[in-house]
UniProtKB/Swiss-Prot annotation:
Protein name as it appears in the record: Inner kinetochore subunit MHF1
Gene Ontology molecular function: any one: chromatin binding
Function (record text): dsDNA-binding component of a FANCM-MHF complex involved in DNA damage repair and genome maintenance. FANCM-MHF promotes gene conversion at blocked replication forks, probably by reversal of the stalled fork. Component of the kinetochore, a multiprotein complex that assembles on centromeric DNA and attaches chromosomes to spindle microtubules, mediating chromosome segregation and sister chromatid segregation during meiosis and mitosis. Component of the inner kinetochore constitutive centromere-associated network (CCAN), which serves as a structural platform for outer kinetochore assembly.
Similarity field: Belongs to the TAF9 family. CENP-S/MHF1 subfamily.
Source species, domain of life: Eukaryota
Length: 90
């Protein structure tokens, strides 16, 4: 697979997860959404995950490692204690 195929496959999987989450969150509400809305959320999530990956790689490199580990994630989540707690519990 090339990068474009990988990206398309990742976005397809992310689309499914975004739509599933919307269904979970909005199941009790009378709110409708369009495929265009799902696509907007997908693109936002994709960009955010890309930025997160870059930050995690930078943290690992700064620590002299070539591999991202949990300490990098905890540093990334340093301003989000609720998420840090969830990561620590798992």
């Amino acid at each position: 697979m090339n990068d474009d195929e990988d990206r398309a496959q990742l976005k397809a999987r992310l689309w499914i997860r975004v739509e599933e989450r919307l269904q979970q969150v909005l199941s009790s509400e009378d709110i409708k959404y369009t495929p265009r809305f799902i696509n907007s959320l997908l693109e936002l999530a994709y960009l955010q995950l890309g930025e997160m990956g870059s930050d995690l790689q930078a943290f690992a490199r700064h620590a002299g490692r070539g591999v991202v580990n949990k300490s990098d994630l905890m540093l990334y989540l340093r301003k989000q204690p609720d998420l840090q707690e969830r990561v620590t519990q798992e």
